[in-house]
Structures are given as C-alpha cells and as structure tokens.
C-alpha cells in the first residue's frame, strides 16, 4: 500500500486491516518509476543503466556498421518504449540515451569523443525513405506513443482515468487535433468547439473570431449534444464579437441548422490509416510529413545486396567515406592522388565512377550481362547520377538485379582501395570482378 496525503494513524489502520506492507513515494510499479512529485534524475538513471548493460561489449568492434545499426534499431531503442508510453521524459534523458546509441553505432562503445560520427545524428534518425537508417527518433517516438492516450480518451470515455489532464507534449496534442475527424451520431463523445466534426472541420477553424469568445473551460468540455440542445452554444459566447465575428456567427448558425443528431455512437477516424483506427506507427510517420524524400532509397534498401554493402553505399551517397579529399580538409594524412590510377585527386565520386581502372571494372562486370553500354564514362557527374540514369534505361524486371550488382561492385572497389592503401596490395582491380 502506498498512502497519498494520508494521516499516519489512518494508514496504519488500513495496513492492519488489509494485512499488506506499506511503502512510500518515490517507488516502482510495474517496472515504472512513480512519484507524487516530479521524478528525480536518479529515478530515471536506472533506465539508462539498463540500456548500457545491453551493449554487447567486446563483440561490438567485430560487428559491421550495418550490424550495429540493427542492434540500435531493434534492441537498444526498444528498451525505453514502455517508459516513453507512460511518462513524458525530460530532454536530458533523451540526450543521454542518444549518446549511448550514437556511440555504439559509430564505434561500438558506450562513449566516444567528438569527430567520430560520419553523419549528423538527426539525419541518421530519419526513416530510410527520407535518407536515414531507420533508427527511431526517441523524442518523436515518445510523442507518437503518448498520442494513444488521447485516442483512448476519445474512443473509450468509460476508462477510469478519462477526464483527467493528460500530460502530453503540445506537438502531440496539435497533431492529434488535425489528424482526427468525427462522424457525429448522438454527439455525446464529440467536443463542439475543438473537434473536427462539421464537414471535416472544427468550429475553431471555421469561426476563429467566435471561438476567441468562448471560455477555455467550455472549449474543453462542451459536447455537440449539449451545445445543440436549446442552442446552448449561443450562450457559451462571452463578450462582443465584432463585425467579423458577427459574420462568422451568422454563417455558423446557417450551417448548424442542417445538423441532425442520430441515435448512434459518434465515430472517430484517424486519417493516416485506411482503417480509420489509430496506430503509433502512423503517428510517428505523420511527424515527418512534408520532409524531403531520399530518391534512391528503393534502389538501395530494396536490393539483394548484404546489409553492410548497402550501408556503405548509403555513406557514399552522403559523401561520408574517408577518401583523400575529406582527410585533407581535416588536416589528416592522406594519399596525394587516387591509389588506383595515381593521376587525379581521390574523391568518392572519382573512385567509384570516373577513375580509368574503375570504369574498366564496371565494363568487365556488365559485359557478360550484355549491359556494357551502361558502364560509366569519364564525363559522369557522380556515382548516384550514373546509377540513376542507368537504372532508368533497364526494364523493370532487371532493375533489382542491377541495383544489387552496382552496390556489390561499389563495395568491391572500396575494399580493393583499402587493401592497396593499408596493406600495400597491388593486385589489379579488374581481377576483382571475378569476386562477383
């Protein structure tokens, strides 16, 4: 038993009657920290420790970047989900978990120093079709998960906690408001002033000057049935409307005269699912609405190539591989020229497309497939540009095979380059085509 603002003698009587133990706040219930005050930092640190314990330790450096990305995406990120659903966690908690996730992804350790991240973390946490690795943004995921409480409050008003203030982020409440529309039946479970029930719009948007004259308490409590009964909505208006408000009032009056309540329950629809039912997954995606897409995502992630090869090409597209041009910008040791041709400056675009030995390599692997016409030329703008133009020239049933071949080819070129730079291996790149 956990007494809340209860006299000690009363608590003792109840304890003796129920024959149960007594504890106090803060405590843990069903794995969650709960308190009658704001949670302390120490109450949440245990969750960060749980995440750190899950790191595979000495095995991590032996894993590829793609392997670590899978662990971050499906294991480490999943640990705080239960907490994010129930509690609006502070930003320091998100930053602490992200520090662990980021460090493990790039270096396989719990902590790293600056300069180890090849791609900005905000970009990594985007969905794969928007240019990221599909690792969830914890803050946005928390908003999406907590939106389920707003949905349950709307669709299941008989729950014991219904009517209580739900501590959700303003972004969560704002998205929920514009994403749910209602088909009115008896009007018992639809808010008159704020819900989108009138031809898919809310009165807040249809008549903003009238809405300003409604007290906040009535905005959150007045149902459609109550408002239409004896024109109660008219008496909700406080103060002078002004001439714009008067025009909106008359238009609203005309629209409401056509509303007839039915003897059925109100039906609420979530617009981001075909079924009309809410899901946290669709809510998470909705927070990225309007974002710029990542054009080659299907070519890359839907191919048959191994994950480590696809992750490398993802870095290539973002120009985040440690070639000579990037090493030079940071004042690090670097080869003066391309390790393959020894004529031009090494960039990732030159290495994969315009280098004379690279072009010969692509010709060799494409010729047996009668696709030698697609081999890159010395005038190619970039690796991605050549890939995209070549992909479009193929019939649809050949595109997936071609994408896989390009990704594997790029991986072999990079491995050959590293063997030459770090191991002094001087074998010809053309001979590596047999590895495919």
Protein language model annotation of sequence segments:
Residues 1-436:
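A helix-boundary/hinge signal
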């Amino acid at each position: 038993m956990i007494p809340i603002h209860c006299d000690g003698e009363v608590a003792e009587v109840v304890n003796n009657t129920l024959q149960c133990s007594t504890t106090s706040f803060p405590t843990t219930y069903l794995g969650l920290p709960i308190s009658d005050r704001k949670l302390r930092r120490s109450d949440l640190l245990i969750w960060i420790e749980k995440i750190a314990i899950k790191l595979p330790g000495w095995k991590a450096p032996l894993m590829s970047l793609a392997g670590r990305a899978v662990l971050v995406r499906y294991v480490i990120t999943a640990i705080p989900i239960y907490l994010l659903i129930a509690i609006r966690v502070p930003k320091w908690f998100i930053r602490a978990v992200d520090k662990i996730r980021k460090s493990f992804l790039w270096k396989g350790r719990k902590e790293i120093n600056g300069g180890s991240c090849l791609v900005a973390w905000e970009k990594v946490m985007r969905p794969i079709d928007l240019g990221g690795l599909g690792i969830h943004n914890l803050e946005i995921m928390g908003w999406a998960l907590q939106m389920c409480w707003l949905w349950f409050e709307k669709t299941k008003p008989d729950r014991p906690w219904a009517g209580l203030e739900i501590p959700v982020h303003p972004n969560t409440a704002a998205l929920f408001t514009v994403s749910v529309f209602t088909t009115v039946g008896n009007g018992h479970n639809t808010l008159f002033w704020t819900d989108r029930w009138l031809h898919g719009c809310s009165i807040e948007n249809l008549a903003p000057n009238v809405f300003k004259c409604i007290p906040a308490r009535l905005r959150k409590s007045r149902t459609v049935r109550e408002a239409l009964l004896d024109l109660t909505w008219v008496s909700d208006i406080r103060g002078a409307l002004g001439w714009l408000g008067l025009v909106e009032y008359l238009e609203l009056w005309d629209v409401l005269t056509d509303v007839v309540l039915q003897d059925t329950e109100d039906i609420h629809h979530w617009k981001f699912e075909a079924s009309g039912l809410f899901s946290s997954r669709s809510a998470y995606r909705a927070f990225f609405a309007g974002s710029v897409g990542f054009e080659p995502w299907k070519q890359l992630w839907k191919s048959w190539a191994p994950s480590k090869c696809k992750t490398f090409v993802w870095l290539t597209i973002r120009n985040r591989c440690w070639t000579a041009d990037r090493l030079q910008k940071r004042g690090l040791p670097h080869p003066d020229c391309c390790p393959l041709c020894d004529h031009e400056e090494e960039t990732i675009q030159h290495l994969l497309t315009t280098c004379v030995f690279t072009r010969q390599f692509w010709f060799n692997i494409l010729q047996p497939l009668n696709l030698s016409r697609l081999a890159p030329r010395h005038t190619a703008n970039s690796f991605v540009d050549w890939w995209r133009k070549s992909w479009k020239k193929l019939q649809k049933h050949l595109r997936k095979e071609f994408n896989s071949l390009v990704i594997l080819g790029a991986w072999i070129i990079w491995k050959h380059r590293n063997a030459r730079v770090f191991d002094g291996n001087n074998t010809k790149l053309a001979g590596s085509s047999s590895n495919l």
